[in-house]
């Protein structure tokens, strides 16, 4: 009996996490169909899981970045710049794709929803102002509020300062980083239970009946995200690596995107992405910086949301849009998306900025935001999945391309 119990425990702790997550997903759906009160009660499991991920993510970023920079060897190359360019190119490509799809399949809205009382930023300058203030945030406040721009700045600064410390101090920082990484792996093993709770409680409390009125809008939104995830991103990965991109793309969607879909938080998915980077044997000095940076500025899903909902409002009001204006909207949506992490409410609260381009009054723009909140069950989940999975995908693409280049140079040598 004891041997059977230990065998079961070993399968649970060392078995395929993806299969366990799929099992949790199916069980969550079944529970929501069988007993709504029981499904609502399991919401606590999901809340605890997301809370644990959010709690460990800031300290993970701080320790990993600090340790990697403090122990960085002189002359050792990192690949942050090409990854950042891929983030920006991916976000702009997503916005451009959303414009094209919205022109081919124009959507309209029923703007009768009461405007939300959340105040959006006044302009793109205010968004950038908020991001700059995040840079100089108090480090304790940055950790408490999960301000990843502030955490990155302090981690980089401390890392450079600690380069001049003695080896004992560097070893201590490395040990601390390894300890936090161990805790992260422990938390991630509870993903199947957390997703079981999230799925069952979401289906029990909201269902999907409220979404049917916005079926076409949702199809355009999710269709854009599918095109970006399965066509645009693989193309960018291929241009970087010159090899079949789909094994990497599908792995990232499966192991990062699925978890992000249910947690609906790029910050909470940072530990998952870090673990996947380690599994792919990527350069730790690179991914310890690029993953939290991606959670802040790599927002392809947000660019799609801003573009599609803005053009839906434009179509509803009968405002003509020419090609130059549509291209300008792509640029504005990409810039807004990169600042989405610095705005309470994320991408939805940046829609009024894009609407302002077309002279749409703020009252109507806020009704569009309210529509976004209604469809948020699916919109936010898909948006987070594409945002977070792309972080690890582009990081892996650049690292693998660099490894291939070094191997080729070694053969020539």
From Swiss-Prot:
InterPro entries: Na-dicarboxylate_symporter, Na:dicarbo_symporter_sf, Ser_Thr_transp_SstT. It catalyses: L-serine(in) + Na(+)(in) = L-serine(out) + Na(+)(out); L-threonine(in) + Na(+)(in) = L-threonine(out) + Na(+)(out). It comes from the Bacteria. It is found in: Cell inner membrane. It is a multi-pass membrane protein. SUPFAM superfamilies: Proton glutamate symport protein. Keywords: Amino-acid transport, Cell inner membrane, Cell membrane, Membrane, Symport, Transmembrane, Transmembrane helix, Transport. Belongs to the dicarboxylate/amino acid:cation symporter (DAACS) (TC 2.A.23) family. Involved in the import of serine and threonine into the cell, with the concomitant import of sodium (symport system). This is Serine/threonine transporter SstT. The gene is sstT.
